[in-house]
């Protein structure tokens, strides 16, 4: 899944 909002934050999994 994603990590936090927005889901396309740096260092997070690209979910967009």
UniProtKB/Swiss-Prot annotation:
Tissue occurrence: Expressed by the venom duct.
A single Gene Ontology CC term: extracellular region
Disulfide bond entries: 2-16, 3-12, 8-15
Domain of life: Eukaryota
Cellular compartment(s): Secreted
Chief localisation class: secreted
GO MF annotation terms: toxin activity
Keywords: Amidation, Disulfide bond, Oxidation, Secreted, Toxin
Cysteine amide: residues carrying this PTM: 16
Methionine sulfoxide: modified positions: 9
Similarity comment: Belongs to the conotoxin M superfamily.
Domain comment (free text): The cysteine framework is III (CC-C-C-CC).
Protein's recorded name: Conotoxin SI.13
Organism: Conus textile
């Amino acid at each position: 899944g994603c990590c936090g909002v927005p889901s396309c934050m740096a260092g997070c999994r690209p979910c967009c």
